[in-house]
Structures are given as C-alpha cells and as structure tokens.
Curated annotation (Swiss-Prot):
GO terms for cellular component: cytoplasm; extracellular region; nucleus. Homodimer; disulfide-linked. Interacts with TXNIP through the redox-active site. Interacts with MAP3K5 and CASP3. Interacts with APEX1; the interaction stimulates the FOS/JUN AP-1 DNA-binding activity in a redox-dependent manner. Belongs to the thioredoxin family. Keywords: Acetylation, Activator, Cytoplasm, Disulfide bond, Electron transport, Nucleus, Redox-active center, S-nitrosylation, Secreted, Transcription, Transcription regulation, Transport. The keyword DNA-binding does not apply. InterPro entries: Thioredoxin (IPR005746), Thioredoxin-like_sf (IPR036249), Thioredoxin_CS (IPR017937), Thioredoxin_domain (IPR013766). It comes from the Eukaryota. The modification S-nitrosocysteine is found at residues 62, 69, 73. It comes from Ovis aries (Sheep). This is Thioredoxin. It is found in: Nucleus; Cytoplasm; Secreted. Participates in various redox reactions through the reversible oxidation of its active center dithiol to a disulfide and catalyzes dithiol-disulfide exchange reactions. Plays a role in the reversible S-nitrosylation of cysteine residues in target proteins, and thereby contributes to the response to intracellular nitric oxide. Nitrosylates the active site Cys of CASP3 in response to nitric oxide (NO), and thereby inhibits caspase-3 activity. Transmembrane segments: none annotated.
Length: 105
C-alpha cells in the first residue's frame, strides 16, 4: 500500500514510524506525464515489497516537503533508512527503482 503524504508533519511522522524499514518516497505531480506512467508500477512494488514503506508526495500539495528534500524534477525517488536519506534518483526508470529497493533492503 502506498501512503499519500498531505503535510510536512505527516511526512516526518511516516519516516519516524518506519523504524528500521526502508522508506521509498515518490515525489510527483498530477500534470507530470512520466509520473503518471510509473505510478501503477510504484503501487505494484508496494504490494510486492510488504516490508518496505512506500510514500507518495504531490509536489504541488506539499511544496514545503519537496523544498526540504531538494526535489528539482519529477518524478524523483528518495530512499530513507532510520529517517536519513540513503539514496535518490530522478526519472521514471522502473528497473532502477526496483534495483535500488533490492540493494537497500
């Protein structure tokens, strides 16, 4: 399941409550074509990797979160462990997304 993040507080809360689990964050926008293309794949990964926390942040709805995470383009995927960013990349690259998850879990 992918959790939709609505605020900076909710983002921080999700990172904190993940504990030892890997957190994968999809920074996207409704008007972004590549974001729409990879969204179903991102959701399917959340079913496949039940021990990983998947979050979705709409950069227009949560501009403060996007700014704090220094998101410059969409989609950007960031990976967190114990509240710390451990990896990130931009672009709708399905293979890289799954490979990065496998590398970090």
């Amino acid at each position: 399941m992918v959790k939709q993040i609505e605020s900076k507080y909710a983002f921080q809360e999700a990172l904190n409550s993940a504990g030892e689990k890997l957190v994968v964050v999809d920074f996207s926008a409704t008007w972004c074509g590549p974001c729409k293309m990879i969204k179903p794949f991102f959701h399917s990964l959340s079913e496949k990797y039940s021990n990983v926390v998947f979050l979705e942040v709409d950069v227009d709805d949560c501009q403060d979160v996007a700014a704090e995470c220094e998101v410059k383009c969409m989609p950007t995927f960031q990976f967190f462990k114990k509240g710390q960013k451990v990896s990130e990349f931009s672009g709708a690259n399905k293979e890289k997304l799954e490979a990065t998850i496998n590398e970090l879990i």
